[in-house]
Amino acid sequence: MQDLINYFLNYPEALKKLKNKEACLIGFDVQETETIIKAYNDYYLADPITRQWGD
């Protein structure tokens, strides 16, 4: 997941296309892609002190 976050940070236009459903991640269907984007948003928008991935 960290690799995906780094990719989104380096290529924000790719994230924009994913959010607009103009693209999807290879190997993931649209629903899985939406789940990944939600996880990214939840992580990225979280307070840096409380940022952590699930156990």
From Swiss-Prot:
<keyword id="KW-0964">Secreted</keyword>
<dbReference type="GO" id="GO:0005186">
    <property type="term" value="F:pheromone activity"/>
</dbReference>
<protein>
    <recommendedName>
        <fullName>ComX pheromone</fullName>
    </recommendedName>
</protein>
<feature type="lipid moiety-binding region" description="3'-farnesyl-2',N2-cyclotryptophan">
    <location>
        <position position="53"/>
    </location>
</feature>
<dbReference type="GO" id="GO:0030420">
    <property type="term" value="P:establishment of competence for transformation"/>
</dbReference>
<keyword id="KW-0636">Prenylation</keyword>
<comment type="function">
    <text>Part of a major quorum-sensing system that regulates the development of genetic competence. Acts through the activation of the two-component regulatory system ComP/ComA composed of a sensor histidine kinase, ComP, and a response regulator, ComA. Activation of ComA leads to the direct regulation of over 20 genes and expression of over 150 additional genes, including those involved in competence development, appears to be controlled indirectly. Under certain conditions plays a role in sporulation.</text>
</comment>
<feature type="propeptide">
    <location>
        <begin position="1"/>
        <end position="45"/>
    </location>
</feature>
<keyword id="KW-0749">Sporulation</keyword>
<comment type="subunit">
    <text>Interacts directly with the sensor histidine kinase ComP and stimulates its activity.</text>
</comment>
<keyword id="KW-0588">Pheromone</keyword>
<dbReference type="GO" id="GO:0030435">
    <property type="term" value="P:sporulation resulting in formation of a cellular spore"/>
</dbReference>
<keyword id="KW-0449">Lipoprotein</keyword>
<keyword id="KW-0178">Competence</keyword>
<dbReference type="GO" id="GO:0005576">
    <property type="term" value="C:extracellular region"/>
</dbReference>
